[in-house]
Amino acid sequence: IVAAGGDYKKIRFTFQEYFRRMSSDPTRWSQPFAALLGAYSAQMGFGLPSIGGKDSMSGTFNDIDVPPTLVSFAVDVAKYGDIITPELKTPGNKLVRFSINKDDFDIPMYENVAELYGKIHELTENGTIVSAYALDSKGVAAAVAKMAFGNKLGVKIDDEVTTDDLFDNGLGDILAEIPADKMAALEEK
């Protein structure tokens, strides 16, 4: 949502869980507990509610269990003029990676994430960010390729960027396109 120009403070979550039938075996409770604890942690960390969901915790037929799954999506309402798309817009623009902080267990440090996402929203609203992509576990390389395909633009990657920089897990990070003439103002902030 943030990469599309939305305001993270207005996000509402929904969840649907699919887990094998619970029993007296305590190990069968660990997956739903861990998944829901993670969802709860994100809601509390951002200070945002879930507006609904459905649980399907009896996902077992005879001796066949469903794959353990927690599906989550989030919604936001915005004006159409505030929405941006991920494809690169203009040759000569720069790409900037906004990285979130995570703790030793790879859990987002929500105070930092909230501040960063607020700044990204502000930069999108004022036109500094013209396109953006929410990174996934595939990292920057996959994101750059997908952003470039849209308008058939290429990307030159600086020599200082390492292979690790290109392929490390980027969950939570945002890759943003910024016009070259707005980079100086961005660096001041």
Regions found by a protein language model. Name each.
Residues 28, 32-42, 46, 51, ...:
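Glycine-/charge-enriched secondary-structure boundary and capping motifs
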Residues 89, 94-100, 105-132:
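A glycine- and small/hydrophobic-rich beta-loop-beta segment
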Residues 73-79, 109-117, 156-160:
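A general structural motif
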Residues 12-101:
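Glycine-rich anion-binding loops of enzyme active sites
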